[in-house]
């Protein structure tokens, strides 16, 4: 069964308050999202597999721990998820980065993939899906389904804020995927926005309406 981890570090909560503030402009918003993503990445990657290696320091030979295997793939959900990638790669520079773009057909309500580029060895990597907001959970759920179809086995979802409705949607569909958030917010409003939330993350990141 998946678990939900709220990373309530003082620095994360401070920066999240600035992100929520409607008076925070796009430049500061982008920088803050990257910073929070980097801080969250420390906890999200806590259980990555390690191997023992022997190295030689200027003094002597010794045994140390290093990451094992193919390491990490970061997969943002376009477009808002892109805002979290810089913070992640600053901490994990060797990570591969994939991209997933989805929209919902207005008639069938089924997800339509309009863009998908993933590392060829996605099945061998620990995959971290990024999206600043987990609202209804539809996009995240569909992106994770697509990743599994492409061979991904070890997936975790990382969001800044999440509504309980979105968390339930993802957990019901993907009980094997752990969810990491900076805040579990109150609810969704009638327009499907997270309350109190942070507005439209994509628009605030890129200065669009």
Curated annotation (Swiss-Prot):
Q: Which GO terms describe its cellular component?
A: cytoplasm
Gene3D superfamilies per record: 3.40.50.2020
Binding residues for uracil: 194, 199-201
> Which domain of life does the protein's organism represent?
Bacteria
Q: Which reaction does it catalyse?
A: UMP + diphosphate = 5-phospho-alpha-D-ribose 1-diphosphate + uracil
Its family? Answer: Belongs to the UPRTase family.
Q: What is this protein called?
A: Uracil phosphoribosyltransferase
What is the source species?
A: Clostridium botulinum (strain Hall / ATCC 3502 / NCTC 13319 / Type A)
Highest classification ranks of the organism: Bacteria, Bacillati, Bacillota, Clostridia, Eubacteriales
Gene expressing this chain = upp
